Amino acid sequence: MKVEIFCDGACSGNPGVGGWGSILRYGDTVKELSGADGDTTNNRMEMTAAIEALASLKRPCEVVLTTDSQYLVKGMTEWMSGWIRKGWVNSKKEPVLNRELWERLLALSKIHKIRWAWVRGHNGHPENERCDELARAAIEVFKGRKP
């Protein structure tokens, strides 16, 4: 099955309360997911949006995952193999941040065939804008306010 995933993360303070939002589209079906965390970073929320969307798929899929996070796209397409080869240290010889999330993404990428795509954030891309709305609404719900 072919699936389009769009995802975004947001933080109120960085670190701070964060939210994530994802849209999954397959055939005529569109599904929206979102959530929040009380103490996180924008990068962790970007990654969580992708993880939750991929984890929600019931069987192996062909996925195009679109995000405005260069950190996420470059991590999965350029940096991951080097981190693994070097024992999860980065080019500065420091432990890779968010390793547990990268490892979850790696495991999910072995289940699904994923093409990682980057789009400029806050630039009028409808699905990216909607994911941002979902992420920000999740922050407000977490804080106890109506979105």
UniProtKB/Swiss-Prot annotation:
User: According to its UniProt record, which reaction does this protein catalyse?
Assistant: Endonucleolytic cleavage to 5'-phosphomonoester
Q: Where does Mg(2+) 2 bind?
A: 8, 132
Q: Which GO terms describe its molecular function?
A: magnesium ion binding; nucleic acid binding; RNA-DNA hybrid ribonuclease activity
The domain of life is Bacteria
* Major localisation: cytoplasm
User: What cofactor(s) does the depicted protein rely on?
Assistant: Mg(2+)
As to how many cofactors bind and how, the note says: Binds 1 Mg(2+) ion per subunit. May bind a second metal ion at a regulatory site, or after substrate binding.
What's the stated role of this polypeptide? Answer: Endonuclease that specifically degrades the RNA of RNA-DNA hybrids.
Q: Mind telling me which NCBIfam families this protein's record contains?
A: PRK00203.1 (NF001236)
| Listed HAMAP family | RNase_H (MF_00042)
Instruction: State the family named in the UniProt similarity comment for this chain.
Output: Belongs to the RNase H family.
What name does the UniProt record give this protein?
Ribonuclease H
Question: Upper taxonomic classification of the species?
Answer: Bacteria, Pseudomonadati, Thermodesulfobacteriota, Desulfuromonadia, Geobacterales
